Regions:
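Active-site activation/catalytic loop segments of kinase-like enzymes and analogous catalytic loops
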Residues: 84, 261-337, 359-375
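A glycine-centered beta->alpha junction motif in the catalytic cores
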Residues: 61-68, 112-130, 148-149, 270-281, ...
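Short helix/strand-bridging catalytic loops that position acidic/His residues to coordinate divalent metals
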Residues: 67-73, 122-131, 249-257, 263, ...
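Conserved NTP-binding catalytic cores of kinases and kinase-like/nucleotidyltransferase enzymes
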Residues: 1-108, 116, 244, 411-432
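Active-site acidic catalytic loop and adjacent metal/ATP-binding pocket
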Residues: 36-51, 56-58, 216-262
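Regulatory N- and C-terminal appendages and interdomain linkers associated
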Residues: 1-37, 53, 154-157, 327-432
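ATP-dependent phospho-/nucleotidyl transfer catalytic cores
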Residues: 120-232, 243
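Conserved ATP-binding subdomain of kinase catalytic cores across diverse folds
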Residues: 45, 50-175, 310-317
């Protein structure tokens, strides 16, 4: 759809029309509406329609990958999954998810809440050097509530299996993820690109390292087979809008049941990419602030997740009406404080190393694969950009390998310390 057809659509839809027109609009005159295409993503069109009564967003899923073209087809059914994910995530975390007003499956068109300025895409805010004081805590809370609430820690086995079956139908979007994150960066692929010639040797090492490819393949296996919770599926800083006071998570069209660490790692990776980019943009002081937010985000997530888990166990023990006793680590089995503590520690350790691994493969793919991040791409000096990218690749490959050995960087504070070492060190000449 284009701007003209979008306006016609809104005017002919009672729900949407009511949201943008005011009672004082003169029915004898052309409706005072404006439309602007604002999407800067890789696969959709996004329009803002404004009138005297308010603003709404209309998002249309294209039948191909926008950043590649019609040669790469993509299912429009993803819009259905996006709507369902927004509804579920808003149920669990209403303060951080926009409202869906309308969905037209035949056109793959979603009408939703307009998130007004000063909110802006978080990636752009970080590139501009803004210091939003609450976004890290908000995103940690979003992860805790949505991952716990859709997992076997909160649901019974029958319910979870039904949900896994339902969300497994979003297989086309999962297949895209599998290709661009777990496969393409490790082979010769026409869609891959990198800063050349500065990163030629680095990209070659990634494609030739058997150890790295094995670790990435094991992470891919977990992505394919581990159905822990309903994931956003593409939770980067471009899928978040934020301001001084508010944060919203948007664009969950890749949603599926998968390993929790994939969503956690997605945010860690994007904040780390932002961190390394600051050497060529906003400087060391702001870089340190970004790294501090990375720590806050994960600490908030871990604390919130464990509190939800502990509260669920307390309610199950007290037989609170309506309280769920999750199938995994049932209260009747883990009936002492020590057993709960051990169970939680083991679970969170595995989740942490999963998160590191998924963060690593995402960092790698954003530098030598398809669909790079503006944090780095907008550094116009190729030598400065490649210096930042080399540091990010060094840490990214370390994280992928650590996810399998589970030796070192056992908490987010240690991750931050290692990131500081890489940031402050000389420009890496190799990944080994």
């Amino acid at each position: 759809m284009d701007a003209t057809s979008i306006l016609d659509y809104v005017l002919n839809n009672t729900t949407l029309r009511r949201l943008v027109l005011s009672d004082g609009d003169d029915a004898s005159q052309p409706p005072p509406l404006s439309v602007k295409e604002v999407g800067d993503g890789n696969i959709n069109f996004v329009f803002v329609v404004s009138g005297n009564g308010g603003c709404i967003v209309l998002k249309q899923a294209l039948p191909f990958v926008r950043c590649v073209g019609e040669s790469w087809p993509l299912t429009q059914q993803r819009a259905t999954f996006e709507v369902n994910a927004l509804v579920e995530q808003r149920r669990l975390c209403p303060e951080l998810v926009p409202i869906v007003y309308h969905f037209d499956a035949s056109k793959a068109l979603i009408g939703m809440q307009f998130i007004a300025p000063p909110n802006m895409i978080l990636r752009r805010a970080l590139m501009a050097g803004h210091r939003y004081p609450h976004f890290a805590q908000h995103l940690g809370t979003f992860l805790a509530k949505t991952l716990f609430g859709t997992s076997l820690l909160a649901l019974d086995g029958v319910t979870l299996r039904a949900k896994v079956a339902e969300w497994s139908a979003n297989s086309a979007m999962c297949a895209l993820t599998e290709k661009v994150i777990f496969d393409d960066p490790y082979i010769e692929c026409r869609h891959n690109r990198w800063t050349s010639p500065q990163l030629d040797a680095f990209s070659g090492l990634i494609r030739s390292s058997t150890e790295l490819k094995v670790a990435a393949a094991l992470l891919k296996g977990k992505f394919l087979s581990c159905t822990q919770a309903l994931l956003h599926g593409d939770l980067h800083t471009g899928s978040v809008m934020a301001s001084e006071k508010t944060t919203y998570v948007i664009d969950p069209e890749f949603a599926f049941y998968g390993p929790m660490g994939f969503d956690v790692g997605a945010l860690l990776s994007n904040l780390l990419l932002s961190y390394f980019s600051q050497a060529a943009t906003n400087g060391a002081d702001y870089a340190e602030w970004v790294l501090e937010q990375t720590v806050i985000l994960h600490q908030t997530f871990a604390a919130g997740f464990l509190e939800l888990w502990s509260e669920s166990l307390r309610q199950a023990e007290a037989s609170v009406a309506g309280a769920g006793d999750g199938e995994h680590f049932k209260a009747a089995v883990f009936d002492t404080a020590r057993s709960v503590e051990r169970a939680q520690a083991a679970f969170m350790q595995n989740l942490w190393y999963d998160s590191l691994g998924f963060a690593g493969v995402k960092m790698i793919r954003r530098i030598v694969g398809l669909a790079h991040v503006a944090d780095l791409e907008d550094i116009h000096d190729a030598d400065k950009r490649s210096d930042c990218e080399k540091r990010a690749l060094l840490l990214g490959t370390e994280l992928v390998l650590l996810s399998q050995s589970q030796q070192g960087l056992s908490c987010v504070l240690q991750l931050a310390d290692r990131a500081r070492q890489v940031y402050a060190g000389s420009t890496p000449q190799s990944l080994v």
